Swiss-Prot record:
Induction: Part of the rapG-phrG operon. Transcription of phrG only is controlled by the sigma-H factor. Expression is rapidly induced in the transition state to stationary phase. The keyword Membrane does not apply. It comes from Bacillus subtilis (strain 168). Signaling molecule involved in the regulation of expression of DegU-controlled genes. Secreted during production, but the mature peptide acts intracellularly, indicating that it needs to be imported into the cell to function. Stimulates the DegU-dependent expression of aprE, an extracellular alkaline protease. Acts by inhibiting RapG activity. At high concentrations, represses the DegS-dependent aprE expression. Disruption phenotype: Disruption of the gene results in the reduction of aprE expression. One of its GO terms (cellular component) is extracellular region. Belongs to the Phr family. Residues 1-33 form a propeptide. The keyword ATP-binding does not apply. Keywords: Cytoplasm, Secreted. This is RapG inhibitor.
Length: 38
């Protein structure tokens, strides 16, 4: 059970980091698009 919890914790950290990185790149693309349109 402990091993499962550790694995779940590691997976959660990796997923949250991936979501944050994906959101940051997306917001940067939106800023570039706004500059091009504006």
């Amino acid at each position: 059970m402990k091993r499962f919890l550790i694995g779940a914790g590691v997976a959660a950290v990796i997923l949250s980091g991936w979501f944050i990185a994906d959101h940051q790149t997306h917001s940067q693309e939106m800023k570039v698009a706004e500059k091009m349109i504006g």
